[in-house]
């Protein structure tokens, strides 16, 4: 289930940003983290990651965890994900991964090997922004991280539909916590 591993390099980060930029999605600036979290909380609920945790993870991962899109200068959509270390992948399988307060050891930092992708959240206030972040996520999962196992724990009915119907995730065998996953893409593994 590990697929092919990827190094969290400058080239990888540039590819990720370039893939998302094609959909008008860009890394959140440090001053935008609170607004991005507030937007997500309004749409998903307050039981999500805190602003401080989002900011910490964004910093630890070299600004490749929280992305935003705007319309007419207003923040309208967010896409958040984590790139996991080998220890993070094991924590997911063991049920010990805490998405609201991920251990630094569970995150793949710049220069380290990425073992898995964890979809942290998607939220948008308009159909245009929703399309941007979902299409951007789809492009990243088929491209930059296609060779990795991908995980998520949807918390809303809309999130469950998105992950299963539009993104092709299935229940993770043996998980009783609502965790879904997508196997590494064969074409990406072969490439």
Predicted regions mapped to residue ranges:
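Short amphipathic alpha-helix that is part of the acyltransferase structural core
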Residues: 2-55, 59-75
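C-terminal "cap" of GNAT-fold acetyltransferases
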Residues: 174-191
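Cytochrome P450 core scaffold surrounding the K-helix E-X-X-R motif
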Residues: 86-92
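Conserved beta-strand in the GNAT
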Residues: 74-83
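Short glycine-aromatic motifs
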Residues: 168-174
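Acyl-donor binding region in acyl/amide transferases
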Residues: 93-167
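Short, well-ordered beta-strand micro-motif
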Residues: 66-68, 80, 180-182
């Amino acid at each position: 289930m590990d697929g092919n591993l990827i190094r969290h390099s400058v080239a990888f980060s540039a590819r990720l940003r370039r893939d998302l930029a094609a959909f008008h999605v860009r890394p959140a600036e440090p001053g935008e983290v609170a607004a991005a979290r507030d937007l997500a909380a309004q749409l998903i609920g307050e039981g999500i990651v805190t602003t401080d945790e989002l900011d910490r993870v964004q910093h630890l991962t070299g600004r490749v965890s929280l992305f935003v899109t705007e319309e007419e200068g207003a923040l309208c959509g967010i896409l958040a994900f984590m790139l996991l270390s080998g220890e993070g992948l094991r924590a997911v399988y063991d049920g010990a991964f805490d998405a609201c307060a991920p251990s630094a050891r569970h995150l793949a930092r710049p220069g380290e090997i990425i073992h898995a992708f964890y979809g942290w959240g998607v939220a948008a206030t308009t159909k245009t922004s929703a399309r941007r972040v979902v299409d951007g996520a789809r492009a990243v999962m088929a491209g930059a991280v296609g060779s990795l196992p991908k995980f998520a724990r949807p918390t809303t009915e809309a999130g469950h539909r998105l992950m299963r119907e539009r993104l092709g995730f299935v229940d993770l065998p043996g998980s009783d916590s609502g965790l879904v996953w997508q196997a590494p893409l064969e074409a990406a593994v072969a490439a």
